[in-house]
C-alpha cells in the first residue's frame, strides 16, 4: 500500500478507505522537530454507540483488532485505565500497551500506545466518533510516531484493522435490519 505524505495537516481530511501518513512539525513548529502522524476517516453502517462499544469492550476489540485468532486484548475504557494488545502475526507476537488518557462516552477516546520490542517510545491514538444519519463516522489520528518503520507498520495495521472493524459491524447491522424486516412482516401478516 503506498504511503501518502503531506507537508502540513489538511484541516478537514477526506473520508477514504486508507489511512494517510503525514509528516509535519511537532508542537511548537520547529522544523528540526518533526513528527509522523497517521490519519484515517471512515463511515460505518452502525450507530455511534455500536462503534464506540467496538473500541471499548474486550470481546469486540479481540474480534476486529487482532491479526488472527491468537490475538488478545485487555481494555479498561476509563481515564487512567490500562490496555494491552497481543497481536499475533505469523510467528511474531506484537505486544502493545498503553493507558487511556481521556474518554467521552460515545464521542471520543484517547490512549497512549507503546509497541514493545519494536520501539519503546510511546505515541498517542485519538479516536473521535460521530453520527451521519443512520451511519457513524470514525476519525482516527495516531500521532507522535517515532520512526518511519513504525509508521509503515501502523499504516498496515490500521488499514487492516479498520477493514476488519467494518466486517465486524456489518453482520450486526445486517442482523438488526433483518430482524426489523421480519418484525414488520409478522405485524403486517397479523
Please name every model-derived segment.
Residues 51-52, 61, 83, 100, ...:
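Hydrophobic pocket/interface hotspot
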Residues 48-49, 101-107, 128-137:
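A short, structured loop/turn motif at beta-sheet edges
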Residues 41, 74, 99, 124-128:
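Short, surface-exposed charged micro-motifs
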Residues 24, 78-83, 107-112:
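Short Pro/Gly-enriched beta-strand edge/turn motifs at strand-loop
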Residues 2-71, 190:
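Hydrophobic ligand-binding cavity/cleft-lining segments
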Amino acid at each position: 500500500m503506498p504511503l501518502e505524505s503531506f507537508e502540513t495537516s489538511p484541516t478537514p481530511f477526506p473520508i477514504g478507505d486508507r489511512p494517510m501518513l503525514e509528516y509535519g512539525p511537532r508542537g511548537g513548529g520547529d522544523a528540526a522537530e518533526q513528527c509522523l502522524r497517521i490519519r484515517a476517516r471512515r463511515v460505518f453502517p452502525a450507530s455511534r454507540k455500536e462503534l464506540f462499544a467496538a473500541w471499548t469492550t474486550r470481546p469486540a476489540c479481540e474480534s476486529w483488532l487482532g491479526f488472527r485468532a491468537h490475538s488478545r486484548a485487555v481494555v479498561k475504557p476509563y481515564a487512567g485505565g490500562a490496555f494491552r494488545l497481543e497481536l499475533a502475526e505469523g510467528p511474531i507476537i506484537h505486544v502493545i500497551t498503553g493507558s487511556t488518557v481521556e474518554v467521552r462516552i460515545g464521542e471520543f477516546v484517547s490512549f497512549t500506545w507503546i509497541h514493545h520490542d519494536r520501539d519503546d517510545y510511546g505515541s498517542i491514538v485519538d479516536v473521535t466518533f460521530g453520527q451521519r444519519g443512520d451511519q457513524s463516522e470514525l476519525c482516527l489520528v495516531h500521532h507522535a510516531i517515532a520512526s518511519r518503520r513504525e509508521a509503515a507498520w501502523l499504516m498496515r495495521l490500521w488499514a487492516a484493522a479498520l477493514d476488519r472493524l467494518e466486517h465486524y459491524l456489518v453482520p450486526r447491522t445486517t442482523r438488526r435490519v433483518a430482524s426489523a424486516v421480519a418484525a414488520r412482516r409478522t405485524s403486517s401478516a397479523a
